[in-house]
C-alpha cells in the first residue's frame, strides 16, 4: 500500500486537560505508532481540544490557564497542536460538535470533503497531473511555491491561534478549491482524510453508562468518525464494547492500540497530578512536564484547591 492509498488521519483528543499530563502526550505518540504499524494509516496531525469552562467539573481551572499549559506540553512536538475553538465558544460543546467543527474546518482549508468511516469521500484532493510538472496551484497566491515544511493550516482567522495538521508534501499534492474547473486533461490522485477521536478506555467505558451520552451523538462519533482507544490500567476493551449495542454495531470502527510498551497509564491522570501538587509530592514530575509544573507554580494553580 502506497502513501497515496493509505488513509491520512488527524487524531483529536477532547478533555479537561486539568492539567495536561505526560500521559496525554504519550497517548498521541502510542496511537500514531500503532496506526502506522497497521500499514493502513498515515497520521498527519494531532489536535488537543480543552473543554469549555462551563463544563462545570469541580476544580476545573480557567481555560486561559489550561490552554497555556497544553501549549507548553506540546511545544516540542512537530505534529501535535492545541486548538482553542472549543474554549472560545459561548458554552460547552459536545464531543460530536467538536469533531464536526474540525471536519468542516479541514474541508475549508484543504478544499476537499473529509471522508468518514462508512462513506469515503468521492471528492479528490487534487494532485499533480501524472507525467507533468506544472507550477503548483494554490487558493492563496501568496503561498510560496516551495514551502520548507509540510505543515498546513497555521492560522485560520486571528482568533484561532495555531491549529494543527500536517500537509502531505506539496511536491506530491496541490490543494485547490473542490469546485475548481480544471478541465479534463488532468489525471488526479485521491487521498482519504479522516479525523479520529483519540481517547482512553475510560471514555469508551463511559459510552456504556445509560443516559450519559446522547445516542445520536454516539452514532456519529463511532459510526461516522471512528475512535482510537489507548487502554488504561489493563482495561478489557472487548468486554467494554460488548456492553453497548452501538459499540458492538460499530466495532470495526474502534481501533484499540496494542503495543509492547508497558506504559503506566496512571500517569495520564490529571487528578493524581493535582493531588501530588497539593501534597508537595516530588513524584509530580512523573505526571507533568517541567514547563507545565513551572507554570502551575508561578500561577499558583491547584496548590490550595481540592478535588
Swiss-Prot record:
PTM comment text: Degraded in response to injured neurite. Degradation is caused by polyubiquitination by MYCBP2 after recognition by FBXO45.
Keyword Cell division: no
UniProt activity-regulation remark: Inhibited by P1-(adenosine-5')-P3-(nicotinamide-riboside-5')-triphosphate (Np3AD) and P1-(adenosine-5')-P4-(nicotinamide-riboside-5')-tetraphosphate (Np4AD).
One annotated Gene Ontology cellular component of this protein: late endosome
First-tier enzyme category under EC: transferase
Membrane topology classification: Lipid-anchor
SUPFAM superfamilies: Nucleotidylyl transferase
Subcellular location: Golgi apparatus membrane; Cytoplasmic vesicle membrane; Cytoplasm; Cell projection, Axon
Residues that bind NAD(+): 16-17, 92, 95, 200, 202, 212-213, 232
Pfam families cross-referenced by the UniProt entry: CTP_transf_like
Enzyme Commission number: 2.7.7.1, 2.7.7.18
The record's free-text note on cofactor binding: Divalent metal cations. Mg(2+) confers the highest activity.
Catalytic activity: beta-nicotinamide D-ribonucleotide + ATP + H(+) = diphosphate + NAD(+); nicotinate beta-D-ribonucleotide + ATP + H(+) = deamido-NAD(+) + diphosphate
InterPro entries for the chain: Cyt_trans-like, Euk_NMN_adenylyltrnsfrase, NMNAT_euk, Rossmann-like_a/b/a_fold
Binding positions for ATP per the UniProt entry: 24, 271-274
Lipid positions (S-palmitoyl cysteine): 164-165
BP-aspect Gene Ontology terms: NAD biosynthetic process; negative regulation of cytoplasmic translation; neuron projection maintenance
GO MF annotations in UniProt: ATP binding; nicotinamide-nucleotide adenylyltransferase activity; nicotinate-nucleotide adenylyltransferase activity; protein ADP-ribosyltransferase-substrate adaptor activity
Metabolic or biological pathway: Cofactor biosynthesis; NAD(+) biosynthesis; NAD(+) from nicotinamide D-ribonucleotide: step 1/1; Cofactor biosynthesis; NAD(+) biosynthesis; deamido-NAD(+) from nicotinate D-ribonucleotide: step 1/1
Keywords: ATP-binding, Cell projection, Cytoplasm, Cytoplasmic vesicle, Golgi apparatus, Lipoprotein, Membrane, NAD, Nucleotide-binding, Nucleotidyltransferase, Palmitate, Pyridine nucleotide biosynthesis, Transferase, Ubl conjugation
Family under the similarity heading: Belongs to the eukaryotic NMN adenylyltransferase family.
UniProt cross-references to PANTHER family, sorted A to Z: NICOTINAMIDE MONONUCLEOTIDE ADENYLYLTRANSFERASE, NICOTINAMIDE_NICOTINIC ACID MONONUCLEOTIDE ADENYLYLTRANSFERASE 2
Role this protein plays: Nicotinamide/nicotinate-nucleotide adenylyltransferase that acts as an axon maintenance factor. Axon survival factor required for the maintenance of healthy axons: acts by delaying Wallerian axon degeneration, an evolutionarily conserved process that drives the loss of damaged axons. Catalyzes the formation of NAD(+) from nicotinamide mononucleotide (NMN) and ATP. Can also use the deamidated form; nicotinic acid mononucleotide (NaMN) as substrate but with a lower efficiency. Cannot use triazofurin monophosphate (TrMP) as substrate. Also catalyzes the reverse reaction, i.e.
Protein name, per record: Nicotinamide/nicotinic acid mononucleotide adenylyltransferase 2
Organism: Pongo abelii
Amino acid at each position: 500500500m502506497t502513501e497515496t492509498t493509505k488513509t491520512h488521519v488527524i487524531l483529536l483528543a477532547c478533555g479537561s486537560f486539568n492539567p495536561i499530563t505526560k500521559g496525554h502526550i504519550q497517548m498521541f505518540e502510542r496511537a500514531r505508532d500503532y496506526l502506522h504499524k497497521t500499514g493502513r494509516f498515515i497520521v498527519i496531525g494531532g489536535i488537543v481540544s480543552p473543554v469549555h469552562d462551563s463544563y462545570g467539573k469541580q476544580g476545573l481551572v480557567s481555560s486561559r490557564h489550561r490552554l497555556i499549559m497544553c501549549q507548553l506540553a506540546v511545544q516540542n512536538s512537530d505534529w501535535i497542536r492545541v486548538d482553542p475553538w472549543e474554549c472560545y465558544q459561548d458554552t460547552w460543546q459536545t464531543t460530536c460538535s467538536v469533531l464536526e467543527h474540525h471536519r468542516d474546518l479541514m474541508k475549508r482549508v484543504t478544499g476537499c470533503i473529509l471522508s468518514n468511516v462508512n462513506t469515503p469521500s468521492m471528492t479528490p484532493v487534487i494532485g499533480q497531473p501524472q507525467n507533468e510538472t506544472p507550477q503548483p496551484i494554490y487558493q492563496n497566491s501568496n503561498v510560496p511555491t516551495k514551502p520548507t515544511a509540510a505543515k498546513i493550516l497555521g492560522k485560520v482567522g486571528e482568533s484561532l491561534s495555531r491549529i494543527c495538521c500536517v500537509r502531505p508534501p506539496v511536491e506530491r499534492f496541490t490543494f485547490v478549491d473542490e469546485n475548481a474547473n480544471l478541465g479534463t486533461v488532468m489525471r488526479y490522485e485521491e487521498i482519504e482524510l479522516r479525523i479520529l477521536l483519540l481517547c482512553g478506555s475510560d471514555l469508551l467505558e463511559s459510552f456504556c453508562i445509560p443516559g450519559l451520552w446522547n445516542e445520536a451523538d454516539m452514532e456519529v462519533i463511532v459510526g461516522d468518525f471512528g475512535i482510537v482507544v489507548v487502554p488504561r490500567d489493563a482495561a478489557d476493551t472487548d468486554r467494554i464494547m460488548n456492553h453497548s449495542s452501538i459499540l458492538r454495531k460499530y466495532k470495526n470502527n474502534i481501533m484499540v492500540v496494542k503495543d509492547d510498551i508497558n506504559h503506566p497509564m496512571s500517569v495520564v491522570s490529571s487528578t493524581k497530578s493535582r493531588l501530588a501538587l497539593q501534597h508537595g509530592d516530588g513524584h509530580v514530575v512523573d505526571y507533568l512536564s517541567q514547563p507545565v509544573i513551572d507554570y502551575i507554580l508561578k500561577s499558583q494553580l491547584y496548590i490550595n484547591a481540592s478535588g
